[in-house]
Amino acid sequence: MSLLLGTYRLATRVLEPLAPRVLAYRARKGKEDPARINERLGHPGVARPAGALVWMHAISVGESLSLLPVIALLAERRPDLSVLVTTGTLTSARMMAQRLPDGVIHQYAPVDAPGAVSDFLDHWRPSLGLLVESELWPNLILEAEARGIPLMLASARITEHSAEGWRKRPAAARALLEAFACILPQDEASAGRIRALGGRDDGRVNLKLVGAPLPFDRKEFDRLSGAIGDRPVVVLASTHEGEEAALVQRLLTLDPLPFLIVVPRHPERSGTIEADMAALGLTVAVRSRKEVPGADTQVYLSDTLNEMGLFLRLAEVVVLGGAFGPLIGRAPGGGHNPLEPARLARPTLTGPDMSNWSIAGAMAEAGGLKILTDLSRLAPRVAELLANPAQARVLGRQAEQAAAGADGGLEVLWQAMAPLLPPAGGR
């Protein structure tokens, strides 16, 4: 073990007694579920089912949702296996509660401290661990390796910034990456960085490129469609802090103003967004308060979870957030999944920071995504698409075709996973 990892493990052991206090503080700030803090300390909330169990871990909403096709694949090909999913954020836990199939267990991931990790693994005894993207928690990884639990890193992603940090700690990087029995980078850039740091490369898998159109509630669609009437709808999807006010302010130049649906990435920001809209002189209805849009409603604030499929279907134009940071003086967000509106043939505009989505460039080249490098172009582009439904349909079809051609490598994942699973009926 490298000196750095040894120091990290010692430090986390010494500091672990403070974890309950830190978690309680975070719960008071709304960043932890106070009813489930024990899970973060490695103490399970439910009993372990008998037989073999596959453990899957992802940190936040996007990564967590990307596990759903894998879970469906396991249910089809290895129905004898139990599945445990761990996530790290409140939002992802709430989303998983709504989206996980019956029988799949969700728990919060333990904090990366030796005692919590040991208790977690003692209870769940996974036959295989599947981690998504860049979840390199030293205690969790090294303890699983020490117990002989095979680990996979799927959709592995290491940015140049992260790689630069790991290059300064080569022994630690190598030790963590060598703990994985299989690494499936999501793109060539990440693959090259992982190989350079001493990790293996077992093929390309990007789970965020796998998936069906988002689900929706037909009754809610009909109800909202009736409330909105014949007003054109523009959806601001997965917006980040600062984007709502900046984007809506530009759209105020449109006459008439389209009906705006704002779906923030983090619904807990609802109060701030509502205040921002009121400051712009707009009338707002808030979904979490069960308010129905009226004839005078200009902005519908969707501060709920698991309803993106509903709102995308209501849209004539989608403005995809998380990508406008460079244009509004905010930190980079990396963008959000352009395939979600594309699978529904929705014409989509987004900002220049799509660094988390290598497919965005190909979609833009194919005409299925419009990337704005200047916010002054937002209102004219939206106006053009609303005034020319035929052009909007062409853009939507191009987006849909680009989504249909995306291959996330689910079969590659299965071929790599199958040999690591216990035999049917095993433990």
Locate predicted features.
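Nucleotide-activated sugar donor-binding and catalytic core shared by glycosyltransferases
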Residues: M1-R427
